[in-house]
């Protein structure tokens, strides 16, 4: 899900009867998208033309990059925390997002942001900004948050768990096994899940989108 579409679902979904669980999925994927972007490019725009995290329906060439701390504290953390609260324990569709998946992504986001604040390798950031947290927390605080939320996920795994052997993780008969946390399930037999479907598919069959 692209950020603009997620903005639209989050902003307008409740007006047309979209369930809290589906809204939580939109929050999860928007938070995940911003998390991937901030790791790759540094600070990225939160305002796509209609205001920060607002649904934009017109072309805009005036977006300005937010800082790395702003992306994390305004987008990544709030969206993933909403997902943790509102998502169900079991996936809505095969391979779909759950409370456990959101907890683990949030844990990784806390860990990554803590490392960014600490900056042990003296890596430059863009746009340039002070490596301080808007809420006044230090790297150690975020590392503790990462530990705490990961422990919650491990103690409450939901439908996930370890297979009996490493062989089973990769063997064909055990496809869609319980070690895979998040993936897009595409099959030729199902019109909705067939990646090559001209109606519903993307013409590309992505499978096993495992948690980074």
Per-region residue spans from a language model:
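An aromatic- and glycine-enriched ligand-binding surface/loop that stacks and positions planar moieties
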Residues: 44, 48, 81, 96-103, ...
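Conserved small/polar residues in nucleotide/adenosyl-binding loops
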Residues: 1-5, 207-212
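Flexible, glycine-rich phosphate/dinucleotide-binding loops
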Residues: 40, 55, 116
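Aromatic- and acidic-residue-enriched carbohydrate-binding clefts of CAZyme catalytic domains
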Residues: 52-59, 131, 135
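Conserved, well-structured interaction surfaces
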Residues: 3-41, 59-96
